[in-house]
Amino acid sequence: MEELKALILSIQFMTGIPIPINIDVKEDKIYKIASYFPVVGLLIGGILYIAYLLLKDLFSREIVMTFLVAFSYILTRGMHIDGLADTFDGLFSNKDREKIIEIMKDSRLGTNGVLALVFMVILKILFLSDIRQSLLFSALLVSPVIARLSVVFSIAISKSARGGKGLGGLLLERAGLREFVIALLISTIAGYFVMPLKDLALLYVISLSFTCLISKYISKKIGGMTGDTLGAVNEFVELIAFIYFSIL
């Protein structure tokens, strides 16, 4: 029952998909939702593929992919792309640790954040449009899964830069190897049915290696990770997955 609660909470937390159920979970148990982030990715990927099937005969491929990228942000309430923008505003402000974190918490968007947001959206559309038709189903399902697996990996290898404040901080302080192993198992099962294992394994190596590097870089700058920087990891790895599928 605890695991089912964690699954529902992870969907409620990571998406705007309405689930009219009030889940009562103790604060010291809420970290378990991290295990099910890849399930959220699979759900989002499935919805995006259905949207693709509905739109593909109505518009050009580029327009359809633009709709899909926009719809993905609607599904997630812009949570991850907002984190990416805040991360760039903070990291490229050339300020000290405390000021960087303060800038990230600021709801106002700066020039660096706008540039990161715009380029991320454009690159996602371009590489998604470049993926072969035969690989599109796999790309739309697996990319959101791998992105969220990478977030769990970052959580497992990092600490909170804000002393455990906020849900992101709580996850960073409490979730660890157990949650990553469960997330990895879920991701592997999902990926096994839609792409060759050798291709999936290589995508794991690329994505998790990048996640390790960027997590260490950010942690060196601000002493850990935050909810915003985890969102940035999600965005970068999803783009990496799109690039990977466009090359296959």
Swiss-Prot record:
A GO BP entry: cobalamin biosynthetic process
Topological category with respect to the lipid bilayer: Multi-pass membrane protein
Pfam families reported for this sequence: CobS
Catalytic activity, EC: 2.7.8.26
Catalysed reaction equations from the record: alpha-ribazole + adenosylcob(III)inamide-GDP = adenosylcob(III)alamin + GMP + H(+); alpha-ribazole 5'-phosphate + adenosylcob(III)inamide-GDP = adenosylcob(III)alamin 5'-phosphate + GMP + H(+)
UniProt keyword annotation of Ribosomal protein present: no
This protein's UniProt keywords: Cell membrane, Cobalamin biosynthesis, Magnesium, Membrane, Transferase, Transmembrane, Transmembrane helix
Subcellular location: Cell membrane
Single GO term (MF): adenosylcobinamide-GDP ribazoletransferase activity
Cofactor(s) annotated in UniProt: Mg(2+)
Transmembrane portions of the chain: 3-23, 35-55, 63-83, 109-129, 135-155, 180-199, 200-219, 228-248
Top-level division of the source organism's lineage: Bacteria
Xref: HAMAP family: CobS
Name this protein carries in UniProt: Adenosylcobinamide-GDP ribazoletransferase
Species whose genome carries this gene: Caldanaerobacter subterraneus subsp. tengcongensis (strain DSM 15242 / JCM 11007 / NBRC 100824 / MB4)
Gene: cobS
